[in-house]
């Protein structure tokens, strides 16, 4: 294997290093239904928290949301205006709003309150957008960012009143602090290779699950391109997976095309479930996964 600093390539290599065994005896047709925060979805394949999709397709953000609604998937949304979020929720997509770690906590709380008011099922924060990679805090389109403390996360959890999910967790230390703050879920992610040599989210998952002890759902983000990729995450204990960049090229073809790929990935997932003796998502078994050593 050729070594690289590219975290996306490292993540892809890790996915491809995991093999599965089959289990046909006593197997049957599977269900991919998933319940999250009291809502039932047809698939654990979620849309990832993307932003600024108008640069990819006209009305890209609402197309993306409509696709999630058509597929019965959880929809995540990233940075954007209040009006855009209202349009997204109006599509009928059950939406989780991920908020940037704005330096001004009043802006964070304002965005939380607006998201709850318009009907988002949950809110959260991508904590990994705090720094610029050059030793300073990040600045996103002129908006200053800042790392958040455990106490600040507690304040956001209390302000939300709905589940608060933290995205960008890639260590046991951060996972433990998020639990201490009262967060209702974690997204294991390196934000599309924001840091070189980052641990693949799927590699970090088992230790994070061990540390959290099943108290909150844990999701996997980054590099998921197929139902087989999703299966590997779910088998190792993830509640659901986020798919973003893999879907972006389809936005120009409309919501139906994006939904079609989500549906295909869900069917691929079901295909692997049936061949490994898994009838429901809560019966996933990590012992079907083997790490390639040749």
Language-model features, listed with the residues they occupy:
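An N-cap/entry alpha-helix motif that binds or orients negatively charged groups
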Residues: 1-41, 283-284, 290-294
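Alpha/beta enzyme core
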Residues: 66, 70, 90, 103-220, ...
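C-terminal extensions of enzymes
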Residues: 1-8, 251-294
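Short glycine-enriched loops at secondary-structure junctions
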Residues: 51-53, 78-84, 128-129, 172
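Short, charged beta->alpha transition segments
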Residues: 28-38, 76-87, 111
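Structural signal for hydrophobic packing residues in well-ordered secondary-structure cores
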Residues: 15-22, 116-119, 160, 212, ...
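Active-site cofactor/substrate anionic-group-binding motifs, chiefly glycine-
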Residues: 35-80
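A gly/proline- and charged-residue-enriched helix-loop-helix capping module
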Residues: 69-105
């Amino acid at each position: 294997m050729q070594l690289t600093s590219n975290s996306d390539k490292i993540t892809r290599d890790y996915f491809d290093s995991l093999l599965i065994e089959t289990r046909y005896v006593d197997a049957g047709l599977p269900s991919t239904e998933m319940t999250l925060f009291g809502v039932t979805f047809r698939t654990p394949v979620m849309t990832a928290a993307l932003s600024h999709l108008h640069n990819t397709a006209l009305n890209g953000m609402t197309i993306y949301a409509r696709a999630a609604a058509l597929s019965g998937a959880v929809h995540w949304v990233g940075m954007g205006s209040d009006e855009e979020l209202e349009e997204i929720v109006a599509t009928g997509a059950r939406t989780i709003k991920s908020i940037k770690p704005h330096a001004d906590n009043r802006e964070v709380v304002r965005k939380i309150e607006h998201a709850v008011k318009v009907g988002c099922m949950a809110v959260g924060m991508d904590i990994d957008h705090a720094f610029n990679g050059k030793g300073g805090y990040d600045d996103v389109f002129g908006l200053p960012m800042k790392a958040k403390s455990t106490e600040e996360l507690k304040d956001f959890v209390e302000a939300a009143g709905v589940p608060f999910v933290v995205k960008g967790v890639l260590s046991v230390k951060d996972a433990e602090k998020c639990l201490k703050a009262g967060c209702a879920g974690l997204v294991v992610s390196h934000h599309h290779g924001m840091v070189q040599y980052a641990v693949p989210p799927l590699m970090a998952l088992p230790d994070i699950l061990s540390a959290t002890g099943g108290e909150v759902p844990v999701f996997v983000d980054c590099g998921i391109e197929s139902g087989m990729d999703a299966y590997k995450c779910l088998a190792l204990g993830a509640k659901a997976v986020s798919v973003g960049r893999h879907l972006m090229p389809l936005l120009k073809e409309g919501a139906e095309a994006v939904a079609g790929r989500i549906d295909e990935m869900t069917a691929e997932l079901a295909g692997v479930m049936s061949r490994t003796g898994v009838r429901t998502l809560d019966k996933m078994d990590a012992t079907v996964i083997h790490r390639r050593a040749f």
